[in-house]
Amino acid sequence: MDSLNNNTAVANEPKWLRIANLLFRYAAAATALWHLIKAFVGVGTPYVFRATHLSIFLFLTFSLFLIESLKARQKVRSAIYAIFTTLAIAMLVYFQLAGERLTMRIPIIGDVYPIDIFFAIFTALAILVAIKRKIGWPMVIICVVLVLYTRYGYLVPGYLNHKGYSWSRLLDVMFMGIEGIFGSTINVTSRYIILFVLFGCLLSKIGASDFINNFANCLVGTSRGGPAKVSAVSSALFGMISGAPTANVVTTGAFTIPMMKKSGYSDVFSGAVEAVASAGGAITPPIMGSTVFLVSEILGLQYSEIASRCILCAVLYYVALLWMIDLEAQRKGLLGTPREQLPRFREAVKGAYVFVIPFGILVYMMIAGYTTTMAGLAG
């Protein structure tokens, strides 16, 4: 029924919107392919690669914003996002033409051209606009305050006082090297996170979420408070291949929350269990959340070493969650799901090799000491 409704909604869309969505998907697919090729053949000049990565994703981000605003008939926002989308394309071209010059440029004393200043300002502004749209004002305010502190640190009293950077030096550090905007964060997202996100999306698209839900039902579905325990187990398993709490909620929550409510849990408790269970995916090896890649980059530790030390944390996290669910089920007198309503174990694990083999390859390569990029690419 949902598939039929989705097909009907797509058929009722204006032709221009269908074309725009199709072009966006092609652009996203090309971006994924480009990252896979770069992971295989090498990234080349780090500065140019990171700048290209950021330019492409700014283009995709504002293209999506533009499509959404056009669909909502918001003329002013559409015009603004159209400008940002166009400038993101110009930014991509700029880095292809000027990337080598900026790479070879001597910091602080090298020449700075007006076009460099223009794209430096645009890059910072575009990032702030995207952050405001997806996260909100608090993160934007934090970024702006930190930039102002870097510039006017001499006005701050006490231990936080420093001489301050001039605007020209601030521009040099933040935009014209691999220490600012194009520093460790962009390095991690462009080389590691993108590959693991693609890996998780691929497994999800070929039916991993259905397998996980059925497998979790077979494991704990009949136990006391079974539906809520299924939510915890399925979120833990999905977190192993995704690591993204939001994707975890969307994928497993659509199935487990209605099941929990139907079995007798309150709306608040059902939502809380799914939120907590999905958040735990960020600390569940081997993929975990994006933060672990930054930790690995900053501390200089192997990703596999960090992941192995998080196993106990993840186990304790989900054991505590299952214990809490069991206590709530005991308090309310809730039983598990009748076995005849659950999928059979043989049916649940049928075709599991499609997910287990690539996942096993990923885990093996990380344990064997291969680089994170190679492990993600092989998976």
What are these regions (language model features)?
Residues 296-312:
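Helix-coil boundary and interhelical linker segments in multi-pass alpha-helical membrane proteins
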Residues 25-38, 57-66, 86-95, 122-131, ...:
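Hydrophobic core segments of alpha-helical transmembrane domains in multi-pass membrane transport
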Residues 113-118, 180-192, 218-231, 263-269, ...:
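Membrane-interfacial loop-to-helix junctions in multi-pass transporters
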Residues 44-48, 72-77, 103-198, 347-348, ...:
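Hydrophobic transmembrane alpha-helices of multi-pass solute/ion transporters
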Residues 2-22, 28, 308-379:
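Long, contiguous bundles of hydrophobic transmembrane helices that form the permeation core
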Residues 213-281, 300:
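Hydrophobic transmembrane alpha-helices that form the pore/transport pathway of multi-pass ion
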Residues 93-98, 249, 262, 281-293, ...:
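Transmembrane-helix bundle segments that line or gate the permeation/cavity pathway
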Residues 1-111, 117-121:
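Conserved, well-structured core domains of diverse proteins
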